[in-house]
């Protein structure tokens, strides 16, 4: 966390530490608002300014090459629900706002065509992240899986999109559950927890 200022020395340190490209993104935003893939040192400051329009905190992340995966999860009424994994294939530079909401700009493949051991590891890491961050309700944990099969957690979407075309509802349906059943679980679990 930094003040809303950055000097040339900071830019050079970012490039030295993380290399290029990097992702500059707000810490609290949705739908990829304020996210920029930065390919040159000169573009870091404008990307930082853009990210600060969405949040008081920003993240600067190494660009990890690989396949993007998302895994939805819910713990309700004492049971873990880990939904089928989705592979996100953006036809743009990355899975930005346009790729998310413009038909034909991305493919979301549920269930993802991945090796069983990678699926098991993503499920394990999703549950670990959910519990470590004390999440409540339904979340989506996003990963990059390198060509060597190593997963990197890139973010936890604590309020994932829940429209009919969003990733988690697709995962829920693939798991054989209706959205109504999912919402009932969330409401009942919240009601029971708040009564304790």
Predicted features, each with a name:
Residues 1-8:
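Short, small-residue-biased leader/transition segments that mark boundaries at the very start
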Residues 32, 107-109, 164-168:
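Short small-residue beta-strand/loop micro-motif enriched in glycine and branched aliphatics
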Residues 37-40, 175:
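A structural signal for short, well-ordered beta-strand elements
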Residues 115-196:
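ATP-dependent carboxylate activation and anion-phosphoryl transfer catalytic cores
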């Amino acid at each position: 966390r930094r003040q809303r200022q950055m000097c040339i020395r900071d830019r050079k340190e970012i490039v030295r530490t993380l290399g290029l490209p990097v992702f500059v993104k707000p810490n609290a935003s949705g739908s990829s608002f304020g996210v920029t893939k930065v390919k040159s040192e000169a573009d870091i400051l404008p990307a930082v300014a853009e990210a600060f329009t969405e949040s008081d905190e920003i993240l600067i992340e190494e660009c990890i090459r690989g396949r993007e995966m998302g895994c939805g999860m819910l713990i309700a009424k004492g049971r873990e629900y880990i939904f089928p994994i989705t592979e996100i294939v953006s036809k743009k530079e990355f899975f930005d706002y346009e790729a998310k909401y413009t038909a034909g700009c991305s493919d979301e493949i549920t269930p993802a065509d991945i090796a069983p051991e990678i699926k098991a590891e993503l499920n394990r890491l999703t549950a670990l992240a959910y519990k470590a961050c004390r999440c409540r309700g339904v979340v989506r944990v996003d990963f990059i899986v390198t060509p060597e099969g190593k997963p990197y957690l890139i973010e936890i979407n604590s309020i994932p999109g829940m429209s009919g075309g969003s990733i988690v509802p697709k995962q829920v349906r693939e798991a054989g559950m209706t959205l109504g059943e999912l919402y009932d679980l969330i409401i009942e679990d919240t009601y029971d927890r708040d009564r304790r």
